[in-house]
Amino acid sequence: MRITTSKSKNSESFYITQSYTNANGKSTSKTIRKLGTLAELSAQLNTDRDGVVEWANEQARLETLKYKSEKEDATVMIPFHSNRLMDYNKQKLFSGGYLFLQSIYYGLKLDSVCRKIKSRHKFEYDLNAILSDLIYTRVLEPSSKSSSFRAAKQFLEPPTYELHDVYRALSVLASEMDFIQSEVYKNSFFLGDRMDRILYYDCTNYYFEIEQEDGDKKYGKSKEHRPNPIIQMGLFTDGDGIPLAFSLFPGNQNEQKSLKPLETKILQQFGCDKFIYCSDAGLASEDNRVLNHMGQRAFIVTQSIKKLPAEDRAWALKKTGFKRLSDDKPVDLTKLTDDDKNQLYYKDEPFTTKKLDQRLIITYSPKYAAYQKAIRAEQICRAEKMVANGSLKKHRKNPNDPARFVNKVAVTNEGEKAKIHYYLDTDKIAEEEMYDGLYAVCTDLLDDNVADILKVSEGRWQIEDCFRTMKTDFEARPVYLNREDRIKAHFLTCFLALLHFRLLNRSLKGTYTTEQLLHTLKDIKFTDIEEQGFMPVYERQEITDDLHETCRFRTDYQFITKRKIKGIQKKSKRR
């Protein structure tokens, strides 16, 4: 509310007016109350014009408070007509799940990052709006860039840019990929501490439905066993499974070599130089261990027992020398009772290679041994059927294929064609049984508690879950992109989407699964009620209550006025 005046030849009148947006989206105003003329009010209040203006402004303030109170508490009456058709081309349903991701986006100060990037480039489009929408749609409606643009039009805050701006922005984002990663890492501390004393590293790859190699898209060993060119990704996460940094490298490159460039970037640009590196055996080469034995770094990596030197392998397979992890009590694995089946047992010894003094820890889990034995029993049954049928695959790519237990011998009489005889390879079965329940870890933490070391190693599932989320839920494979810069920007978007999602889930204290949170965010929608406001059309649950409490705004009122919606949008961008 505000004061307006109307002057004539002989008098000046004072009014309280209110500004509002009409049905056509234009700003206009209306008179709420006439206060009187200057002469009347001066006589009534016994003051001059300045005193009248001061009094009038106070009346406008009180009228504003009264209006707000009535709007907050009033029952909204909106007429509907059963004989009136809907208007053409009028959007009625809006998506609102992005609001919760938006609170993370602005918490990471990505709007400030975009302003810094703009100062180094010449473009007119709104990079902040484009990047934020790319992230939100990757979580809520993963698809091509054009489809994502259409999906963003369903948001309560639709795009003000055009599709061609999106493709132009991809080139800029690709050129600033390293800068964006380092900035969001530093800014993530505004949203809580990072467990960056433990860093997990792993690699995956993404295939392209093309027939020839192109740029970094090279033929390599696909995780999906596809015969297509691939691009590989290396990913670091912190100890909580929250993404830290990523890199892309050609599909035909040995993934062991991908670690050093990315780790160097973390050391130099992130200011993160004291951590324990943890990976599986595939990324635990001698050089990678040496790299993480320097400075204030250390490593905990899994070790293939089969690839140990003969003497160490023989020691690992012996059933003697084990202790119970819970109390360090020596045990004989051949005399375990049923009560001992749920325990974990270990033994350790110095393990010296050409370049490093390490510690080799062997663990034994009766429960895991029983599981492996049960799986193998099923595979042996299938192998026996293959022998009985005399049929065997020529090419066996899967190391867990039951056909690995089938061997063959050529039987022939002199001058006759050889006859192939298949048989069950019991020696192969016996060899595998020796490794049941066993697991090996190598570390340069020579004096640390074994239980603590194993706990860190067990956390590797989190980075595997990150890849699963990106590939399955965020549909990260860039089917519709060919240019190298746009592919980089696409994976940057996927990385940032994963970071937003993980940080949001962490703010909920990890109470909900990935599927539960994704389903909830996608379901949060609103319908426009005759341009008077919005009505939520989703189911209120504990998870929605927790989201509102965490992000400090609520969208679950029975009816939300347009003014309130704008307030919610503003709160979602509050740092």
Model feature map: region roles:
Residues I3-T5, S11-S13, N24-S27, L108-R575:
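Anion-binding and metal-coordination hotspots
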Residues M1-N128:
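Conserved glycine(s) in the ABC-transporter nucleotide-binding domain "signature"
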